[in-house]
């Protein structure tokens, strides 16, 4: 299935690219999420007319993402968790706990944006967690885990 991308999609292409994708990916994800349209001649003509508008919208989204990333880079969150004397947590600190700590600081974020490739954190200490606020912008969030009293 051929589609025209209406925005940048990670590991697929940029705005305006005509790409070949599997039918299920196109019909069930890209098109319903307004990330792409079918690559018909009529849609190609409509896209060319709307290209400037879509590029402006993409630039605004990138600028907003860079502002959010700057705010996140300057932020350190402190999470208190029950831990043993050796510093091992009685559980773990994952995406939900980090998201909740950011919401307490009035920073809106979705769980999908927080990336923890090694999985949840299991011990006390300072960590750097990646936050993908945009496909081109990655922020580094400082997370400090302290033992609960």
UniProtKB/Swiss-Prot annotation:
The keyword RNA-binding is assigned to this record: yes
PROSITE patterns recorded: RIBOSOMAL_L9
GO biological process: translation
InterPro entries tied to this protein: Ribosomal_bL9, Ribosomal_bL9/RNase_H1_N, Ribosomal_bL9_bac/chp, Ribosomal_bL9_C, Ribosomal_bL9_C_sf, Ribosomal_bL9_N, Ribosomal_bL9_N_sf
Top-level taxonomic group: Bacteria
GO MF annotation, one: rRNA binding
Keyword Zinc-finger: no
Record's function text: Binds to the 23S rRNA.
Family: Belongs to the bacterial ribosomal protein bL9 family.
Protein name per the record: Large ribosomal subunit protein bL9
């Amino acid at each position: 299935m051929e589609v025209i991308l209406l925005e940048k999609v990670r590991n697929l292409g940029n705005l305006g690219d005509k790409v070949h994708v599997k039918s299920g990916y196109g019909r069930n994800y890209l098109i319903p999420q307004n990330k792409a349209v079918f690559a018909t001649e009529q849609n190609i003509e409509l896209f060319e007319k709307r290209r400037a508008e879509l590029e402006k919208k993409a630039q605004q989204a990138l600028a907003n993402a860079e502002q959010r990333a700057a705010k996140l880079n300057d932020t350190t969150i402190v999470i208190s968790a029950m831990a043993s004397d050796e510093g091992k947590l009685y559980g773990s600190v994952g995406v939900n706990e980090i998201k909740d700590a950011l919401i307490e600081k009035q920073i809106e974020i979705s769980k999908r944006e927080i990336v923890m490739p090694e999985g949840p954190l299991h011990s006390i200490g300072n960590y750097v967690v990646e936050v993908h606020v945009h496909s081109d912008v990655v922020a580094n969030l400082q997370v400090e885990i302290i033992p609960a009293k």
